[in-house]
């Protein structure tokens, strides 16, 4: 499978226990780019046991950027001496990934994943899903 090395939108999973304690208050200033995230606190594994709490994050860069840069930007949310994220991936379809934040996709429904309410998506720095969808179509 080919890996996408440059993209405008990047997503990753971060673990709160490794994030700076004030991350929710300073995320906009730290990332300095439009973002949306959803905290996953109700997910269960295949044995119906609670999965470790985590945060799904999408960052929108003004232009295409590299995997390495996107990962470094998201890693700024890590607590000192800790690593909250170890990998990220390019977003191929922004609407699909935006819906995945709350598990509102066909695949998530088939897998029986917990559906989070739309208001659990937290946006900042002028994240505008409608504008990004239009850019993707143009």
Provide a role label for each language-model segment.
Residues 1-11, 15-24, 75-138:
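Catalytic "initiation/cleavage/transfer" segments centered on a nucleophilic residue
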Residues 71-73:
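Intrinsically disordered, low-complexity regulatory segments enriched in Ser/Thr/Pro
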């Amino acid at each position: 499978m080919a890996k996408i090395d440059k993209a405008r939108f990047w997503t990753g999973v971060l673990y709160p226990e490794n994030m700076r304690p004030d991350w929710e208050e300073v995320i906009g200033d730290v990332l300095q780019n439009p973002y949306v995230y959803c905290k996953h606190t109700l997910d269960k594994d295949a044995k119906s046991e609670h999965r470790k709490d985590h945060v799904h994050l999408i960052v929108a860069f003004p232009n295409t950027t590299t995997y390495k840069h996107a990962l470094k930007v998201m890693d700024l949310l890590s607590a000192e001496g800790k690593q909250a994220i170890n990998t990220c991936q390019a977003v191929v379809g922004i609407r699909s990934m935006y819906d995945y934040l709350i598990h509102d996709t066909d695949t998530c429904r088939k897998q029986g994943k917990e559906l989070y309410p739309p208001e659990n998506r937290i946006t900042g720095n002028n994240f505008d899903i409608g504008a990004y969808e239009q850019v993707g179509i143009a």
